[in-house]
Curated annotation (Swiss-Prot):
Cellular component annotations (GO), alphabetically ordered: cytosol; small ribosomal subunit
UniProt keywords, alphabetically: Ribonucleoprotein, Ribosomal protein, RNA-binding, rRNA-binding
Pfam family of the protein (one): Ribosomal_S20p
Name under which the protein is recorded: Small ribosomal subunit protein bS20
Keyword flag Ribosomal protein: yes
Gene Ontology MF: a single term: structural constituent of ribosome
Physiological role: Binds directly to 16S ribosomal RNA.
NCBIfam families (UniProt xref): S20
Family recorded in the similarity comment: Belongs to the bacterial ribosomal protein bS20 family.
GO biological process: translation
Tree of life domain: Bacteria
Amino acid sequence: MANHKSSIKRIRQTIVRSERNRFYRTRLKNIVKDVRSAITAGNKEEAASAMGVANKQIQKFVSKGVLKKETAARKISRLHRAVNAI
């Protein structure tokens, strides 16, 4: 266990941030899954609307520091390419 007040606080902060990031990462996986399922169903309108939601949320996760901007750009690019291939 930590002995210093500052390290105890850091541990507390890490726990809170880890929980928050886990929530965001789970949400990201579900959003991407929605887009992928619309693509496999062949429903272009549903895939396009899900892509709009995914794009907005992925950019929000970048601003919150959950994702790096390069990772987000790669995810968005791959999803757009898959939607356009329908």
